[in-house]
C-alpha cells in the first residue's frame, strides 16, 4: 500500500541499492574478518541488479517506473523478511498469525495499481484509506502511518547488551 518512506522520499527511491539497507558498511563492521572476506556488499548489490532485471516495467513515466521498482523490491525482499520473522516468532509462541493484506490476490492487484492512487494528497496508503473511509472515524482515517510499536525496557536493554557482549566475545561466532 506504499506506506514505507522509500516509496515517497526521493532520496530513498533514487538510491542505486535496496533503500532499507543503505548503511551496509556500518553493518558489515559488526562481522568478523573471515565473514568480511565473503564480499557481502558486492553480493547484495548483485542481488539488487538481478531483481531490477526481473521487473516487468509498463509503459510508464520515470516517476511511475521508480515506484514500480520500489513495490517489486519491497515485495520480493523487505516484506519477505518481515513475514519470515513474524511467522517464526508467532510459531515459537504457538500463535497463529494472520496477515490478510499479504494475500497473493491483494498483492498482485496492488502491484498494478498506479502510484497516483496509492499516494494521494501527500498521504500514504490512499487505496486502503479510501476503501475504509465510510467505516472509520476521521481521526483514524487521517492518522499518519506509524511503524510497529516500539517499547523501552531497561531490563530488556541490559539483557540484550549482555547477550551481545557474550556473543562478540565468542571467538567462534561470525560477529
Regions found by a protein language model. Name each.
Residues 2-28:
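A mobile, often basic/glycine-rich helix-loop segment
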Residues 20-175:
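Adenosyl-5′-phosphate
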Amino acid at each position: 500500500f506504499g506506506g514505507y518512506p522509500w516509496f515517497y522520499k526521493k532520496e530513498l527511491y533514487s538510491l542505486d541499492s535496496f533503500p532499507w539497507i543503505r548503511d551496509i558498511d556500518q553493518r558489515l563492521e559488526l562481522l568478523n574478518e573471515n565473514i568480511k572476506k565473503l564480499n557481502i556488499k558486492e553480493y547484495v548489490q548483485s542481488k539488487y541488479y538481478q531483481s531490477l532485471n526481473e521487473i516487468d516495467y509498463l509503459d510508464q513515466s520515470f516517476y511511475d517506473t521508480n515506484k514500480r521498482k520500489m513495490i517489486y523490491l519491497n515485495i520480493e525482499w523487505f516484506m519477505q523478511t518481515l513475514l519470515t520473522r513474524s511467522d517464526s516468532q508467532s510459531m515459537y509462541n504457538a500463535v497463529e498469525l494472520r496477515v490478510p493484506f499479504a494475500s497473493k490476490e491483494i498483492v498482485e492487484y496492488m502491484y498494478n495499481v498506479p502510484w497516483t492512487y496509492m499516494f494521494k494528497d501527500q498521504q500514504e496508503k490512499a487505496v486502503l484509506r479510501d476503501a475504509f473511509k465510510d467505516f472509520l472515524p476521521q481521526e483514524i482515517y487521517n492518522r499518519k502511518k506509524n511503524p510497529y510499536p516500539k517499547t523501552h525496557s531497561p531490563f530488556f536493554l541490559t539483557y540484550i547488551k549482555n547477550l551481545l557482549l557474550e556473543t562478540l566475545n565468542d571467538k567462534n561466532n561470525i560477529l
